[in-house]
Amino acid sequence: MVDQNPKRSGEPPVWLMFGAGGTVSAIFLPVVILIIGLLLPFGLVDAHNLITFAYSWIGKLVILVLTIFPMWCGLHRIHHGMHDLKVHVPAGGFIFYGLATIYTVWVLFAVINL
């Protein structure tokens, strides 16, 4: 018999943020490291152009994506890694996902006020 009122989990939105963070980290952060770590110091990219891009709406969106999603991924990994190591933090999900939410709100305010 199939349960007509299945218990819903709160995990799918968290897994969405975790997956997005892993994807962003793997695909886009190497490009950011290349631009900021190599091209900018060697003068191949003008700093004024980067600053102008950061102040545009698409630049703000890029900053949001490159900062928020990897943080969710990292805190999700720490939360589940501690569980795998048998270190059970009381209300661990609330703590780690709460920190990610606070960070998200903080970054949103910071980037919007650029």
Curated annotation (Swiss-Prot):
Family statement: Belongs to the FrdD family.
UniProt keywords, alphabetically: Cell inner membrane, Cell membrane, Membrane, Transmembrane, Transmembrane helix
BP term (GO), one: fumarate metabolic process
GO CC terms in record: fumarate reductase complex; plasma membrane
Keyword Cell inner membrane in annotation: yes
InterPro entries assigned to the protein according to its UniProt record, in alphabetical order: Fumarate_red_D, SQR/QFR_C/D
Positions of transmembrane segments: 24-44, 50-70, 92-112
Record membrane topology: Multi-pass membrane protein
GO molecular function list: succinate dehydrogenase activity
NCBIfam families: PRK05470.1-1
Subunit structure comment from the entry: Part of an enzyme complex containing four subunits: a flavoprotein (FrdA), an iron-sulfur protein (FrdB), and two hydrophobic anchor proteins (FrdC and FrdD).
Lineage top rank: taxon: Bacteria
Function: Anchors the catalytic components of the fumarate reductase complex to the cell membrane, binds quinones.
Main location: membrane
Location of the protein in the cell: Cell inner membrane
This protein's name: Fumarate reductase subunit D
